[in-house]
Amino acid sequence: MKTNLSSQITLHRVSPRYYRPENAFEKSVLTRLEKIPTDIYESVEEGANYIACEIAQTIREKQKAGRFCVLALPGGNSPSHVYSELIRMHKEEGLSFRNVIVFNMYEYYPLTADAINSNFNALKEMLLDHVDIDKQNIFTPDGTIAKDTIFEYCRLYEQRIESFGGIDIALLGIGRVGNIAFNEPGSRLNSTTRLILLDNASRNEASKIFGTIENTPISSITMGVSTILGAKKVYLLAWGENKAAMIKECVEGPISDTIPASYLQTHNNAHVAIDLSASMNLTRIQRPWLVTSCEWNDKLIRSAIVWLCQLTGKPILKLTNKDYNENGLSELLALFGSAYNVNIKIFNDLQHTITGWPGGKPNADDTYRPERAKPYPKRVVIFSPHPDDDVISMGGTLRRLVEQKHEVHVAYETSGNIAVGDEEVVRFMHFINGFNQIFNNSEDLVISEKYAEIRKFLKEKKDGDMDSRDILTIKGLIRRGEARTASSYNNIPLDRVHFLDLPFYETGKIQKNPISEADVEIVRNLLREIKPHQIFVAGDLADPHGTHRVCTDAVFAAVDLEKEEGAKWLKDCRIWMYRGAWAEWEIENIEMAVPISPEELRAKRNSILKHQSQMESAPFLGNDERLFWQRSEDRNRGTATLYDQLGLASYEAMEAFVEYIPL
């Protein structure tokens, strides 16, 4: 069973010669804008395994010399694959950590003595508890020390690092604001280990660990920039498209305290290891025509023309030969003969992505339409990772499919229970208890006792405590009710609303279980029952919480199993990926764009507002301060504006989709 198919999605084929040059000359040409040596790997596993091998080699070399190997290690998601490979090498290849010294790069402050959400605990769970390292060789900042002793404590931490001869290897991730460890924007090049106040972006990111922004510590004790740069070798890791923007700033941008990771440009032995998704904003991947000759394909041509339009401020049909020649695109003139020929091709390509019939227009020529006309009506399944992603990401299209008489099913893949605030539980329990009393059912003590029990639990609940199973159930019921209300508003019969409650999600914690066969079978059974002609899935692979990717992997795994068995329904089914909750499709990748009128946009907003528990007080709004309906409208209007600027029809808003073809 293949459970990581989303990681193999490439929106456009990147020629291997852009990221795996054949010789030193080619590499120097491709990377001439990059100021830190950067290696791009086809997968996270490939990159992580390479870094793990480099670390293992250093450990073994130090062992032979009878010396310690000093590692500075972070927590977080980026190094987790490296740690997994090191554990495998320890268990299967005899890699010993007896000569390894580990310094934890940072710790949240303040923490209570029994805090379970510390960075050090994460580091132990991911690596230290699984290898034979001497516990006396592990050092970490103390998140519980008194404030008046922190300055001296940090000075001694630096001394301890130096007492072992300095750091041999520093392993880094890169934060959303370009931070390394918790060196936030504004950190100085000569900074050492210190207490630092976390900015809102870092606290929002850390809130995934602590549950809510209110529970997240306001500061951190972190290794300084100069401490990290003092390492003999530095590896910066980044995986996934949500890291792409910061990688470009770090690798190609100027050295600046606004992007602390850019300080790595001053190190003579720093290396950046990224996967293809994280490389997408680097010039050699995103705009290869600026550094080399290109292997042109339709999507790369479209990307180049959109870029040229934005650079010149012109719509597609007004671009001239001069525009192409002056901006590194003369190869296209040689291929097509003139700007006019290129312009017409790309204009028509984009024009053909626009359709007001997302399920296909019956009795019409579908040669140049993104969806086929037959069969009509279609059976449609919209997979929604959380109980509101359907309306946030494709509420306009969903409503259009219903109005055009297709059989629309919505499958809510997870309960979304941990994203409901405690005050929502109290509010609903007030109602249930009051209802019980008003309608002469007060002698039934079950409700009143459960009401008192839940009130007591929530009152005594401490930061980091897990909700009881009863409270998680109530939170799940709240979200089910909201989803049903939104579905009814969109005229979807409730017998076509499916709550899958995939088991991987039901941990009661932010950290979820890995996807399992049970998750895939639930999805597969639904597909077998409905036999859809269209499937819509979440394409928000940069979702900061990871649930969207796992849910999409469950659908893709189920489809893959059906494909292996030769399921007949799959031969007449198309799969479309939507975005909207966390990002939007780039225009060069869009294959279907559904226009939304002002009235339809208002209806979409109303659908989103049915999910009242996900408004201002929702625990997981991410780093974007806008509410979900605001983000959605801004992105939909932004897509329509871009089409307008390129010289195509002007609409109020547009929802965009990319087709997924089973591998």
Curated annotation (Swiss-Prot):
Where are the annotated segments for Glucosamine-6-phosphate deaminase-like?
Answer: 1-290
Among Gene3D superfamilies, the record links this protein to: 3.40.50.1360, LmbE-like (3.40.50.10320)
Signal peptide bounds? none
Active site, UniProt feature = E184
List the GO molecular function terms: glucosamine-6-phosphate deaminase activity
GO biological process per UniProt: carbohydrate metabolic process; N-acetylglucosamine metabolic process
The entry's family comment says: In the N-terminal section; belongs to the glucosamine/galactosamine-6-phosphate isomerase family. NagB subfamily.
Q: Which PANTHER family match?
A: GLUCOSAMINE-6-PHOSPHATE DEAMINASE-LIKE PROTEIN BT_0258-RELATED, GLUCOSAMINE-6-PHOSPHATE ISOMERASE
Protein name, as recorded: Putative glucosamine-6-phosphate deaminase-like protein BT_0258
